[in-house]
Amino acid sequence: QYSYEEGADMTIDEVLRRVDFSGVRLVEITGGEPLLQGEETIALINKLLEKGYEVLVETNGSMHIQEIDERVTVILDMKTPDSGMSHKMDFSNLESIKNSDEVKFVLCSRNDYEWSKEIISRYRLEERCKVLFSPAFGLLHPRDLASWILEDRLCVRLNIQLQKYIFHPGERMV
């Protein structure tokens, strides 16, 4: 399923007007999977950059990121084995990651943690970008993940999904 809520079709100009009206200079494009919109997403990114916005694109890693402008910060959400979605990852995206990008692993278990360490090592991610580890809410306690990171002296950021703690997990507030 692409979206859990009804949306509204908007032109790029309509999106730009809303962004301009907000007064915010940082725009994150996320989804679903924003790259499923193809050329429309790329066109929106380019228009935002032309207007001087700082742009972030959060992608689930199933689509190629090579067409995204170099000025954009890509947040690549790596699917771990226990998510049941790791087979959908396009691992060639890891070759295109640049210093300003982020690779985020949402971990469900110690197995996911070990797998993620292997991916970080294989693609030299600690040297090439920011790496974030997030414990899956209700499946892995943040304290356990923090302990493993410290024991292994990993150069990663512990990233807590704050919306899961602020709002009820079933709410769609953010």
What do the predicted segments below correspond to?
Residues S3-E5, K98, Q163-H168:
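Generic, ordered loop/turn and secondary-structure boundary motif
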Residues G32-P34, N60-S62, K79-P81, V106-C108, ...:
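Active-site beta-loop-alpha junctions enriched in small/polar residues
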Residues I12-L16, S86-S92, R143-D144:
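Short, acidic/polar
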Residues Y2, S92-E95, I160:
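Flexible, active-site-adjacent loop/turn segments at secondary-structure boundaries
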Residues Q1-V72:
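Conserved Radical SAM active-site core
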Residues I42-S121, E126-C129:
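Radical SAM/AdoMet-radical enzyme domain recognition
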Residues R17, F21-S22, S109-V174:
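Auxiliary Fe-S-binding modules of radical SAM enzymes
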Residues G7-M10, M89, N111, L140:
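Short coil/turn linker and secondary-structure boundary residues
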